[in-house]
């Protein structure tokens, strides 16, 4: 298990522990009443985030994922899983090509774990999903307005826009989409389905 997996495992276990404490005792830490309003708000916010992570960790992983890039169908994706990359790396994800600025949505329900930048991915978003899986959206041209860590998301939630940030400069605009489980990266292509909105999916289920 690599360092990133260890960190996410720790977050999951901490979330489960916090959630279990509330379930068993029926209340949060009694010391919260002695905090200042700001401290109490921060404690409440942290608890809410841990609760979201805990509930997601207890759920079975999603068997199907909604296409994250608007206007792209699954059959348009050229399989790039495992392709050789610089430094002898294997490609641990799928590149989904589209025009710069094309909207990128969450492929699943979950909670935003990170909104930031790194050298390889450029502007990236991590979403924590059911079963503790992490969904990685990289090379974004920009983030969705007001998107922040801790936000609950659905397949209707805009995360950002297709771009070429990070080590994708000089390539056609695309989204690098990765999926990570406890054992490491898994190929997202077999899980992807053509995009439908969460509202439409709910209507189909309720028929």
Regions found by a protein language model. Give the residues of each.
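Positively charged n-region of N-terminal signal peptides that target proteins for export
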Residues: 1-6
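Hydrophobic membrane-insertion alpha-helices, especially the h-region
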Residues: 8-23
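A cross-family glycoside hydrolase active-site/sugar-binding cleft signature
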Residues: 78, 138, 178
């Amino acid at each position: 298990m690599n360092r990133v997996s260890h960190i996410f495992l720790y977050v999951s276990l901490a979330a489960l522990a916090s959630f279990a404490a509330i379930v068993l005792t029926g209340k949060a830490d009694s010391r919260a009443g002695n905090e200042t309003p700001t401290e109490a708000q921060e404690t409440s916010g942290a608890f809410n985030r841990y609760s979201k992570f805990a509930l997601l960790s207890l759920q079975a992983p999603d068997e199907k994922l909604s296409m994250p890039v608007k206007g792209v169908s699954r059959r348009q994706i050229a399989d790039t899983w495992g392709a050789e990359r610089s430094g002898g790396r294997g490609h641990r994800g799928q590149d989904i090509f589209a025009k710069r600025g094309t909207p990128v949505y969450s492929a699943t329900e979950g909670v935003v774990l990170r909104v930031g930048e790194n050298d390889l991915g450029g502007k990236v978003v991590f979403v924590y999903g059911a079963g503790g899986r992490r969904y990685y959206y990289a090379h974004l041209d920009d983030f969705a307005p007001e998107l922040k860590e801790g936000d609950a998301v659905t397949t209707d939630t805009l995360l950002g826009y297709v771009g070429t940030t990070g080590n994708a400069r000089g390539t056609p605009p695309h989204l690098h989409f990765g999926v990570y489980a406890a054992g490491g990266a898994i190929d997202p292509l077999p899980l992807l389905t053509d995009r439908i909105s969460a509202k439409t999916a709910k209507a189909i289920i309720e028929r």
